[in-house]
Curated annotation (Swiss-Prot):
Organism expressing this protein natively: Xenopus laevis (African clawed frog)
Molecular-function GO terms, alphabetical: misfolded protein binding; polyubiquitin modification-dependent protein binding; proteasome binding; ribosome binding
Compositionally biased spans, kind Basic and acidic residues: 1087-1099
Subunit-level organization: Component of the bag6/bat3 complex.
Protein's UniProt keywords contain Hydrolase: no
Gene3D superfamilies: Phosphatidylinositol 3-kinase Catalytic Subunit, Chain A, domain 1
Domain Ubiquitin-like: 7-82
The entry's keywords: Apoptosis, Chaperone, Chromatin regulator, Cytoplasm, Nucleus, Secreted, Transport
Gene Ontology BP terms: brain development; chromatin organization; endoplasmic reticulum stress-induced pre-emptive quality control; ERAD pathway; internal peptidyl-lysine acetylation; intrinsic apoptotic signaling pathway in response to DNA damage by p53 class mediator; intrinsic apoptotic signaling pathway in response to endoplasmic reticulum stress; kidney development
Biased composition (Polar residues): 212-227, 367-387, 1116-1129
GO terms under cellular component: BAT3 complex; cytosol; extracellular region; nucleus
Skewed-composition ranges (Pro residues): 673-692
Gene: Bag6-a
Name of this chain's protein: Large proline-rich protein bag6-A
SMART domains, sorted: UBQ
Length: 1135
């Protein structure tokens, strides 16, 4: 390769702009970043180049990634640890407000400063273990300044005063106006980073300072006192200030709007020969258009604010439509998995402390309150809320112990292009001095590090998709017709044990009156914490998919406008120690006045037990960690859209379990960590149900529960069919964007198993599959007629279901799997003395015999349950059998299954296949860990090398007994010997579908004619031809091809392309037409076959068929008798 050769690379940035660079082919990735840094405005150390889902490494050359002429994506990376990890005064408390989509201010902490972890691991620092143990969390969410972000604030300390949505609207408008100010500065030629000169600062500080100062001041409660500070609603005067700011922005924008109109009026015909003039005009169009978009969002944010003049003074603002009105779920039909999202989501969790230690002398108490005014309400660059100890020095006596600084965990869900990351910021950014945050020890109910269960891939995709739609809807102000705030339901969870309390007792949540009670028998252990952590990880999707503006406590009967709340009413007794103070215990009896019906004592008997069974199945939590705790339980309030049946089911189960005794078993021990949350296994694999009592959860209730959970998890992915009746085939076709995955004769898995999979996917919905996976057999019971008809047609080929015929069909079916089995196990190590191919074939024969006999002969109400038990037992035995053959190597068994799935899914989206294999691998680990089948039970299925094969059946039954129709027996008694320029080939009989003779004494045509063709070929060819004939009978035939197509085809290909031509049998033609169209007869298939086999109807059909073909040949101008002599001979004269 010459040294002067060039390559052209296109770089696409997050603002959807593309730039093309021509560089040397030998340039490294590091040098390329430096080359483009001046054009993209991002320094090389912050650049992250992504191509086809891979991050380009700096030590490699650009040509190694084959990006010549391709498009690579550029995102701004998060530099590790740009802020001090311990102590030291923070520099962010006095920084001017900065928008998330603006350039960072010099000297201010980076937006992505501190450490981060990729989504899927959730390896959070030890502080997270302290946060999940905090009590009385409150949640509020705020849409971003331009509608493209969503902030979820989770305060895990005492209930803060509920912030009103009108104030959030005003703050949102103020932030949007700040962004417009920055754009106007750019238009006017000012520097981007000159934030101090913005006229908006004064109005923002005046409007926001009160909201920020009110929030910390109202939380300075002393022990034993109730928080009764009213909600901080904005006054109309604050609204007036925002409107004045809007007017000033419009005045500044007016001259640029005039120039904007002039440019657009002449844009149609202007030549723009001057490049500088063209670029300047293009810059004005882009910036003014962006300003108009932001201005519209600001107007939408404040347009719903109202003031009721008939109310008593002082009057305040309220909203006529909540924010959720603009953020209903929508579906982007043009997008398929993976959904690439250009939106950033910030989740901020704050918790004020259980660490009761002295603040250092240079703490925030000595800072003037004026430092608050420059700190934004919604976390942007700093993303740090003000400290609760932030007040004038006169309010903080030197001898008092002020509240410690809040600890902040900011989870930045940066779904920019394919990159998603979580950003953990656990430092005191709002304080002026360092604070000591000791890691909890095992004695405090936690460990140095806690592993949060990772969310499944499709869960994060659904969350990302949902957030995108809400952000787009909020940004555009689009109304969702008929959208109502979804109903809420309450899950009761066990309270997390406190840090320190008297032995044998635990403080329960205070009631509405402020009194506290104690419950004996509570023990300290990490089980409750891990259980709550699992609930947080499982419900974070709810918090993100259904945002709220007002955090409202209460029960499921609350009429709050919030669409999702997460509240915990566990005990607030906690203590911690610092390096210079002794341990203290502070008990707060603060009662949120909005919490009126949350129980403050023991829940109804049996509620925890039954809901633990439900949640343990659906959310992957440990039932023992839920049902075996009898202390006061925090309530988790979640929203499920459009699920009145689900709410009714919850009410029914709570009422039905009033008399169930409470479990008094001890709490789960520290060594028994709850399993991580896992989604339901994919439909492509069956798994046994968990050991749950089916009588406690009726099928109707379970169906409504599954519909609600799937609706919440899949979000807008299931928006096309909220009833839960969409079939799996329709769901996959909608996601993949193709329509031939499960169509008859489509490419993909063929033969009997492909048709069976098609039948299941067309008749089962996702709800049905989840019900089966959890032990409910009703879907199989409903599928009984279709299964019986399918096995009669495809398995037995319309013969009587006698034991002999079923065995022959099973043998013929499994013999065709020999090559697949040998290929699948070729890459793994098998026991030396085990014939794994024979072991699997004979095992499958036995299982198919049992299952087929049950499907064809069972007609009572136990059909579904027994079939499900058979399938589960077969699955466990197959796993145990092959695990034994593979020397107990679980990884080898998993790789065999995943590799087979990949081979069968070549035409399916690779992302979908990867998700199926990864989830299936996790599910297999769970199944293999609780294997109920022992090695001794499966020894009877093991076939050793050198063992004598089973005695075959008589020769008349060794091969499928071919009983050819009377019309074609003469021509099909032996294979047709065809000659061609390519050589001699043997064509299979015209009827390639094997038909089993119901009468065992009927002579077979193959036996009668085998000597005729066997004598005409060399003896060594006979077994080869017989095997080839057997294999071809199992191949799903393709549609007939024209003679013109076949005439130009080589002999070897033409041999496999021979169709059956027109179906001269009326019953066969109708049967195939019914199968192709999915039609079902009103009567049974046997009755239809008997009626169609009538000799008179058959004769009329043959006559009409020949007439139609003759008419087609006469009317076809391109038909040539010399070119198609066989057709002329076949259809001349009467039939």
């Amino acid at each position: 390769m010459a040294a002067n050769e060039k390559m052209e690379v296109t770089v696409k940035t997050l603002d959807s702009q593309t730039r093309t660079f021509t560089v040397e082919t030998e340039i490294s990735v590091k040098d390329f970043k430096a080359h483009i840094s001046s054009d993209v405005g991002i320094s090389p150390e912050k650049q992250r180049l992504i191509y086809q889902g891979r991050v380009l490494q700096e030590d490699k050359k650009l040509k190694e990634y084959n990006v010549d002429g391709k498009v690579i994506h550029l995102v701004e990376r998060a530099p590790p640890q740009t802020q001090p990890s311990t102590g030291g005064p923070s520099t962010s408390s006095s920084t001017s407000p900065t928008s998330s989509n603006a350039a960072p201010v010099p000297g201010a902490p980076e937006r992505n400063g501190n450490s981060y972890v990729m989504v899927g691991t959730f390896n959070l620092p030890h502080v997270m273990s302290g946060l999940v143990r905090q009590q009385r969390p409150s949640v509020s969410t705020v849409n971003g300044n331009d509608g493209s972000t969503l902030d979820v604030h989770i305060n895990l300390d005492q209930q803060l005063p509920v912030q009103s949505e009108p104030r959030v609207r005003l703050v949102l408008a103020q932030h949007i106006l700040q962004d417009i100010q920055r754009i106007l500065d750019r238009l006017e030629g000012q520097a981007v980073n000159e934030q101090a000169a913005e006229p908006m600062d004064t109005a923002e500080s005046e409007g926001e300072a009160s909201s920020r100062e009110t929030l910390p001041q109202t939380t300075q409660n002393t022990d034993g006192q109730s928080n009764t500070t009213p909600t901080s609603h904005p006054s109309p005067s604050e609204y007036v200030e925002v409107l004045q700011s809007l007017s000033r922005v419009e005045e500044r924008l007016a001259p640029f709007m005039q120039r904007y109109r002039e440019i657009l009026s002449s844009a149609t015909s202007d030549a723009y020969e001057n490049q500088e003039e063209r670029e300047q005009s293009q810059r004005i169009i882009n910036l003014v258009g962006e300003s108009l978009r932001l201005l519209g969002n600001a107007l939408v944010a404040v347009s719903d604010l109202r003031c009721n003049l008939s109310s008593a003074s002082p009057r305040h603002l309220h909203v006529v439509r909540p924010m959720s009105h603009y953020s209903g779920p929508m579906l982007l039909q043009q997008a398929a998995i993976p959904i690439q999202i250009n939106v950033g989501t910030t989740v901020t969790a704050t918790g004020n402390g259980t660490h009761a230690g002295h603040m250092p002398s240079d703490g925030n108490a000595a800072q003037p309150p004026s430092t608050n005014t420059s700190e934004p309400q919604r976390p942007n660059t700093e993303n740090q809320p003000p400290s609760n100890g932030e007040r004038p020095a006169s309010d903080a006596p030197p001898t008092s112990v002020p509240h410690p600084h809040p600890r902040v965990i900011r989870i930045t869900h940066q779904t920019v292009e394919p990159v998603m990351m979580m950003h953990m910021n656990i430092q005191d950014s709002a304080s002026g001095g360092p604070t000591t945050i000791p890691p909890p020890t095992a004695g405090h109910g936690g460990s140095a590090h806690i592993h949060m269960p990772g969310l499944p891939p499709e869960f994060m995709q659904a969350i990302s998709h949902q957030i995108t739609q809400q952000a787009m809807a909020a940004a555009s102000g689009q109304q969702i017709p008929g959208f109502q705030a979804p109903p809420r339901f309450v899950f009761t969870r066990p309270a997390a044990p406190s840090f320190q309390f008297q032995p044998g007792t635990a403080t329960t949540p205070p009631g509405p009156g402020g009194a506290t009670t104690t419950v004996p028998g509570a023990t300290v252990g990490p089980a409750g914490n891990a259980s709550l952590a699992q609930m947080i990880s499982g419900l974070v999707g709810q918090l993100l998919m259904h945002p709220v503006v007002v955090a409202q406590g209460g029960s499921s009967t609350s009429s709050s406008t919030s669409s999702s709340t997460f509240t915990s009413t566990s005990s607030s007794a906690s203590s911690s120690s610092s390096t210079d103070t002794t341990s203290t215990t502070t008990t707060s009896s603060t009662a949120n006045p909005t919490v009126s019906s949350v129980p403050s004592s023991q829940p109804p008997p049996g509620t925890d037990q039954h809901l633990s069974q439900l949640l343990g199945s659906l959310l992957g939590t440990a039932s023992s960690g839920m049902s075996n705790i009898t202390m006061g339980s925090p309530s988790i309030t979640v929203t499920v859209p459009g699920m009145p049946a689900f709410l009714q089911g919850v009410t029914d189960i709570l009422q039905a379990t009033q008399t169930v005794p409470v479990s008094t078993a001890p709490t789960q021990s520290a060594s028994q960590a709850p399993p991580p949350s896992s989604p339901p296994p994919p439909p492509a694999h069956s798994s046994p149900p968990p050991a749950a009592a089916p009588e406690s959860l009726p099928p109707e209730f379970f169906t409504s529960v599954v519909q609600g959970v799937l609706s919440s998890m899949l979000g807008s992915l299931s928006a096309a069919d909220q009833s839960g009746t969409e079939s799996i085939a329709a769901f996959i076709q909608r996601l993949s964007g193709t329509h031939n995955i499960f169509q008859p004769d489509a490419e993909g898995p063929g033969g009997f198993f492909g048709d069976l999979l098609t039948l299941i996917c067309h008749n089962f919905s996702l709800v049905d599959m989840v019900m089966l996976l959890h032990g409910h057999s009703q879907p199989l019971q409903n599928l009984q007629p279709q299964l019986r008809s399918f096995f009669l047609q495809e398995y037995l080929h319309q013969v009587d279901p006698t034991p002999n015929n079923i065995q022959m069909a099973s043998r013929n079916l499994t013999n065709g799997l020999e090559e697949y089995i040998r290929e699948s196990f070729a890459s793994v190590t098998v026991r030396d003395d085990v014939d794994i191919t024979r072991t699997n074939i004979e095992f499958l024969q036995d299982q198919f015999n049992r299952i087929t006999t049950h499907i064809l002969h069972c007609a009572d109400s136990t059909f579904g349950q027994r079939l499900l038990e058979m399938c589960n037992q077969s699955l466990f035995e197959w796993l145990a059998l092959n695990l034994y053959c593979l020397r107990g190597d679980q990884n080898a068994l998993t790789s065999v299954i995943n590799e087979r799935i990949r081979r069968l899914s070549l035409d399916v989206s690779p992302v979908l296949v990867s998700w199926v294999t990864s989830v299936l691998s996790l599910r297999l680990q769970v199944l293999l860990g609780q294997m109920p089948v022992t090695e001794g039970e499966i020894q009877r299925h093991v076939r050793r090398v050198g063992d004598a094969p089973q005695v075959p059946e008589p020769s008349s039954q060794e091969q499928p007994m071919e009983t050819m129709p009377v019309d074609c027996q003469n021509g099909a008694a032996s294979p047709v010997l065809a000659t061609h320029s390519g050589g001699v080939l043997f064509l299979p009989p015209q009827s390639s579908v094997p038909t089993i003779c119901p009468d065992s004494d009927h002579p077979t045509q193959e036996d009668g004619g085998s000597e005729q063709w066997a004598a005409s070929v060399p003896p060594e060819w006979v077994p080869v031809i017989r095997q080839d004939m057997q294999n071809q009978r199992k191949i799903k035939q393709q549609p007939p091809l024209s003679d013109a197509y076949l005439s130009g085809m080589p002999a070897k290909r033409r041999k496999t392309m021979q169709g059956e031509g027109p179906h001269l049998s009326l019953s066969e033609a109708v049967s195939r037409a019914m199968k192709a169209t999915g039609a079902k007869p009103e009567s049974s298939a046997e009755c239809v076959r008997r009626e169609l086999d009538n000799s008179e109807a058959q004769g009329r059909y043959r006559e009409q068929l020949c007439q139609d073909i003759q008419k087609t040949l006469q009317d076809n101008e391109s038909y040539s008798a010399q070119r198609f002599p066989n057709t002329q001979r076949a259809f001349r004269g009467d039939p």
